[in-house]
């Protein structure tokens, strides 16, 4: 077998390369503005307690449709998000919080 060498074309300088378009798809790329990381309000304020008997605190973690707000939106840490979920489910079970928005009497 004879040794074959592959000849690669010489690399061009950056300035000589054709420019790539700065967009993909239909329009220019949109950059998201920097968003500040949300802080768990229960970790920040140690006096605030998660209790299933306090529906005022729990309502801020429920959407208008009665769904539990996810952690990435509420800004809670995983420990407190689990506690909030459990407290909301307990409060729903004993009818302190409505299960869905259709159960709310206006």
UniProtKB/Swiss-Prot annotation:
GO terms for molecular function: small ribosomal subunit rRNA binding; structural constituent of ribosome. HAMAP family: Ribosomal_bS18. Part of the 30S ribosomal subunit. Forms a tight heterodimer with protein bS6. Keywords: Ribonucleoprotein, Ribosomal protein, RNA-binding, rRNA-binding. The keyword RNA-binding applies. The keyword RNA-binding applies. PROSITE patterns: RIBOSOMAL_S18 (PS00057). It holds the Pfam family Ribosomal_S18. It comes from Geobacter metallireducens (strain ATCC 53774 / DSM 7210 / GS-15). One of its GO terms (cellular component) is cytosolic small ribosomal subunit. The gene is rpsR. This is Small ribosomal subunit protein bS18.
